[in-house]
Amino acid sequence: MASRDFLGGFGRDGGQAPVGGAGAAPGPGGESDEIELSLGLSLGGCFGAEPSQEGRSADPRLQRSSSVASICSLPAATTGTSCGAQDAGPGPAAAPPPDLLRTSSLPAEYMEDRLRRRAMQSQRRLEAKRKRLERRNSMSSGRPVPAAGGRDDGLEHTVPSGFQLRRSVALTTAGSPTPSRPQQGPADRRAAEATGPDGAACHDEPQPLPLRLRTLRSLTMRTASTGDLRSAMAEDMPMVSYKAEGPGGRKTDGFLYKYRKGEEVRIVCVCHGSFLTPAEFVEHAGGGEVPNPLRHIVVNPQQSVFL
């Protein structure tokens, strides 16, 4: 009972407990203020009790404004005197609130510049891709790559391709005759450089430097690898031969074809290049049918048809 009186006195404006033991007291308007024991919160009032009706009407409320132009929740301004009394005559009509314009996050010019930059970047990518495709096609076909802007076309036509260099080096190493040039002295070389093919002096045009043949080492390595391959093939596929009996018997050569374990032996004849069995090889050489053809075939591992 004492706690109930204490809460009742704390919730009232006067802060005094009621004289009687009742939990509610009649107010000025005949209404009783009940004690609220919940932990509710009120704006501008006491804890545990709602504000009075007069205080609620006098309490200004916060008005929210909308960004949409057609909706406005602000109250219209009223005219009045300094003492709060209204004028006798009707006041002028309140002007409508100005339209609130909504703005975008980015201006239109920025979007246009951005789209323009994207278009330029895509165009540059397409141009670079087209150039790469042209360069790849020209390299695969063996034609010279077209010169870029600002480069001399005549200088590129004087440079031979890699295929031509390899072919010339192969012909030179094979023993093909090459035209010999007479040795020129330093004075003759300087005179030839000073005068052009038509006899006119040329000093401003730079002479292209001679290209060094860098394929000699590759050819040497290729020859060595080919020799190793031939020796390996001679070991795997030795030379065989068969000579028919009799004064007019002829000798037929071939090589033992590489075979796996469990497979039938095959001999390739040199004259026709046919794959034959040992019995067929003996018959092909003119020996006829023999009981053991492998005993009549001579194997010579020192010789090979590839050497």
Swiss-Prot record:
One GO cellular component term of this record is: nucleus
**UniProt cross-references to Pfam families, sorted A to Z:** EAR, NLS_NINJA_AFP, TDBD
Q: Region (Disordered): which ranges? A: 1-159, 173-208
Residue ranges, compositional bias (Gly residues): 8-30
Locate the compositionally biased regions of type Polar residues.
Answer: 63-83, 173-183
**Is the keyword Nucleus in the record?**
yes
**What is an annotated GO biological process for this record, any one?**
signal transduction
Task: Give the main localization category.
Answer: nucleus
RNA-binding is among the record's keywords: no
Per UniProt, the keywords (alphabetical) are: Nucleus
Q: Which InterPro entries match?
A: Ninja_fam, Ninja_motif, NLS_NINJA_AFP-like, TDBD
Instruction: Tell where it localizes.
Output: Nucleus
The entry assigns this protein to a family as follows: Belongs to the Ninja family.
The name on file for this protein is: Ninja-family protein 5
UniProt source species: Zea mays
